[in-house]
Amino acid sequence: MSAAHELPIRERLAHWVEHLTHVLPAQAPIRDFVHHNTLHGFQHLPFTEALASAQALTGATTYWPESRFRECLASGRISPDDLSAALDDFGVGDLDQPVVRNLTRRDILLASLRFGCEAPNACRQAWLLDETSLADDPLFAYFCRSVELAPSKGASENWQVQALARWDALCGRVGRTWTWRALLEYLSGEDVLEWTRSILQRHLAAHLDLGVAAWRNPAQGQGFFAAWRASAGLDMAWEMDELPNARDEILHLPDSPLDVLLEELPRLVPDHSQWYGYLERLSLELPGWSGMFLWRDRNPGRGDGTPIAMLDYLTVRVLLERLLTDDLLRRLAGSPLSLAELHAYYAARPEEFLVRAALHEPGLPEDLLGRAAHLVQLAREGHVDVAEWRRLAAALAPAMAAAQDDGAAWQMAGLSRQLGLTPADLEMLSGDDLTALQTCAASLSSLQRGHIWLLAYERHYREQLFSALTANHPRQATPAAPSAQVVMCMDDREEGTRRHLEEIAPDVATYGAAGFFGVPMFWQGLDDAGKTALCPVVVQPTHLLRELPAAGEEGSLAGHAARREKRLRWNERLYQATRRRAVAGPVLTALGAVPALASLLAVTLVPGWFGETARRWREQYEGRVSTRLGLTAEQPVAATPEQPQLGLTDAEQIERVEAFLRMIGLTAGFAPLVLMFGHGSGSQNNPHLSAYDCGACSGKHGGPNARVFAAMANRPAVRAGLAARGLSIPDSTWFVAAEHNTCDDGIEWYDLDSTPERFQAAVDRLLGQMAEACRAHAAERCRRLASAPFKPSPWKARQHMIGRANDISQARPELGHATNAAAFIGRRQMSRGLFLDRRVFLISYDPVGDDDGCIVEGILLAAGPVGAGIALEYYFSTVDNERFGCGSKITHNITGLFGVMEGADSDLRTGLPWQMVEIHEPMRLLVVVEQTPEVLTAIVGRQPPLQELINNEWIIVAAKHPITGAIDLYCPRRGWLPWSGQAVLPQVARSVDWFAGESQPLAPAIILGGVR
């Protein structure tokens, strides 16, 4: 940032706004939700450094609590060997060097990790001594007597000196790690951010609105600053009327937000070098609103045309900060006091500052805390004599010094217990020995300890997975002459669907790939008002594919469109009338109460039946229209994302079909049927619906992509072009398309009426097999859902899933990508017949014939960021759901059709809701590639995006040799490390034999059924 200080102020501000994209959430409006790395702005750093930087900047937790990891250790999800190996992997030096007698550093650190470093504060420790048997613990008693604790900092100093030093340190944080709001909250207990948010949120929601706001600011077209300032003159119930002269001051501000910002910033931060840091901290106080405003600023074409500039937002935030802190200072001091005078004010009143600071010391005795709180409350109501502040400060100072006790006796007693030391053993140790023991145990920071636990956690799962792959290597599990080949999305949820299908129909072969199936496109369905991108979010499609009425269906389309438009229009009128009309609203509400109650009872008591009935009635009213694809363009045109080409030329279709089939290794041995199986999710009352859809389709449904690919692959012109390129699809093969609803496990089939008669029997058989597989998959999903039936039959499980999908009160219609942990890139035979618990992304790739790695390079570049984005968003939303996630769905309200808030007054919540991650196990994605280490090394060496992900350890990569099956794990510091472990796995006949009755994560197992 230093170079930016040499630029003119406008360029500096533009540079600062650009830099904010690296620290603020980058979540698109919620209807376009796409998984991404929550810490995308730190991805250029190694994983450990990035987490440390993010925690320092935001205060968020970046690892699971140690207590959760210790629960895993107790339950066997982490073994002692895993923890010991993690110390080696982390790079702790001299692990086998003795520290005290025969105790090595490894022994001491392992004991410290097992016990933990969290000690109760002095107040809690005193209670334990009085109320429990802690005082009788011989180890604790020994250390209370014998351990020489370093005196608490400042214990012998004059309390005025302590107070002044603490006050200077706090003031020094302003502009660096704190805003004035944070300092004043520390002093007063009053948070001006609560008022700021209340003032801002309705204006922000209206300005960013995407179609729901009933009120529009007349000045909205002039930008956010102008619109907000205009409200000071127009709003009869303005939020800031309690502030003296605020309305007049705001109305007389300069018209330019830049001029206002340059006028206000020096009042908050006189040092220009701290301006960016202050703006950054100010933005991070409301990261959701700040991030959405910035996203709309950076993506101007994704709204309704309302001008949105981050400069406007920052100007309003800075102005509010100054106005509200001035008001709080006036009330705090009892008279006008500027921010510039605040340091001197409390430097002259150290006794008052010390009493206020005492309220932030939870270890103080309750009586002293009560007296401090009472005196601060009296100060709010009137004047408090300085003598009272001084008397209480003198009593608080020694207690505050004692509260800083680091709990060494507690920690040393617990550590000794883990090491198996008795008081007799300790008597034989010198003071230097005890100091060395304590120093060694405390040598790891909390972040380092968290990462070591994460390494152990990941290793345990990795060992299970490598054992499974090794045990499965000799099994040739691919059918030689498949009756059908089913191409599904790489999505981890489809791992279960594929496994059950192969158990039911062992002669079916399955493949996995990114769910846009190599066809990046805009799609416009028959009833869609506009086009939608169906491809990875980093891809800009330039082709538009449309769903059109089939020949002879033009009349049906006209009637369908008219009835649908009428239904939607009356729905909208009823909705708006009940919201806005003073008379019609209550009348309509009263008239609709009885049918609304009946509907509510039905959707609550029998949601599945009600949902299916409503869908049938809607279809009967609107009428069904047979459709076809507007697929082929006669000539290529110069296309852009803004002006896309309608359809694809023959050459473009040939190119896309060939590239995709070669990528997944399907170039010969075609079955009679090839099913392209996209996916999406459907549920009710679910603002985060896009988060359950296909990530490779920008959080939309992948069915249209499957349909387009199948239609292209069936065209004679395309097949002729493919044959000329050496890829022959025989006339005995037909492509069909369908979409899997991952929520209710239903299937929507496309264009079956165009299937030639000779394939009809095979299609009917495949329809039955797919339906049976989805029912079996629903039964497996039930085991992780607390409200699902226990060990249900497949039919009952499917009915339960239909009910969940239609239940408006269901916060967990499905679990999404929860528990995702790994990705396999290789032939299906490496994983077919393995129970992987729906935790693995399965991506098809045939290493035979790809000696230079060009094909797998493309797969890694496309699938790597997608899988990493999903895994990392789940990771961070799990470890700190309050900061990186969006809390509970139960309290969410949709705001402006672009996000969710908690209740009616909160920050905009980004990330994943708790119900999506509550069973997730946070770990980095393990990517196993069926290729040699040499080829993968060359690929990473020439691809900076992969270097960032792999060398910075955001994902973990392993190579499985295509011939020998040997597995090597990649470590950026040490290169490729050969794996050698046990390859013994339990074996069962069917998946249900392994998961029935189980509700917790399951280790891999070999499934004997379904493999020929």
Curated annotation (Swiss-Prot):
Subunit structure: Forms a complex with DabB.
Gene assigned in the entry: dabA
Keywords: Cell inner membrane, Cell membrane, Membrane, Metal-binding, Transport, Zinc
UniProt organism field: Dechloromonas aromatica (strain RCB)
Family of the protein in this entry: Belongs to the inorganic carbon transporter (TC 9.A.2) DabA family.
Cofactor dependence: Zn(2+)
Subcellular location: Cell inner membrane
Record PANTHER family: INORGANIC CARBON TRANSPORTER SUBUNIT DABA-RELATED, UPF0753 PROTEIN AQ_863
Residue positions binding Zn(2+): C489, D491, H679, C694
GO cellular component: plasma membrane
Keyword Membrane: yes
Record protein name field: Probable inorganic carbon transporter subunit DabA
Bilayer topology: Peripheral membrane protein
Molecular function as annotated in GO: zinc ion binding
Domain of life: Bacteria
UniProt xrefs under Pfam families: DabA
Function: Part of an energy-coupled inorganic carbon pump.
Main location group: membrane
